[in-house]
Amino acid sequence: TPMSLLSSAGESGAGSGVKNIVFFDNVRVPAKNLIGGENNGWQVATTHLELEHGTGGRIARNWIVDRIFDHCKETRFDGQPISSERFTQDKLIDIYIDAEIGRLFQLRNYWMRHTGASFTYEGPQASYFRKTSGLRIATNILEILGPHALTNDEEIAVEEGHIEAHQRAAIIALHPGGTTDIQ
């Protein structure tokens, strides 16, 4: 069954464009092909969900945050960097706080995963925060840059169109499958 999905033309993981879903009814899997053993399917499924929903963790910084900070320092308006405006500074602070809180959640989860610690709420917490803070970050970037954040036009695009792609991706990342609140 083809599904035409909203695309940011560069989603990681799922890819972009048309998706196909295949349904099987009354299928029996031979015991030798079971993943995780008999009656252990739920454990296999939840392990996948744990990894998908943030328990893998990560240590990388948010590259879009670094780019927007550099852009605001380097771009001048009336002879001054736009980062010197109080409004822009307030928005940049909000962006930085959201990015670093999310990074701390991911660092914690990375540490837990690699030390063999047990997870309870940590993965869904990081996933939910990543999704909601991503939209807040995109909104703050839009408020700083205005319409320049929404175009990939060569003459006026910010960061070679990466900001425009980030704006589209932030909406999709809020709920790439299901709803934001279901973790």
PLM features: residue spans?
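FAD-binding core of flavoproteins
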Residues: 1-77
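Tryptophan-centric aromatic hotspots in well-structured domains and transmembrane helices
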Residues: 22-23, 42-44, 71, 97, ...
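Glycine-rich phosphate/cofactor-binding loops in nucleotide/flavin-utilizing enzymes
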Residues: 39-58, 145-183
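Hydrophobic packing residues in well-ordered alpha-helices of helical domains and bundles
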Residues: 61, 85, 92, 123-126, ...
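C-terminal helix-coil-helix/basic helical segment that borders enzyme active sites and/or dimer interfaces
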Residues: 73, 77-86, 100-157
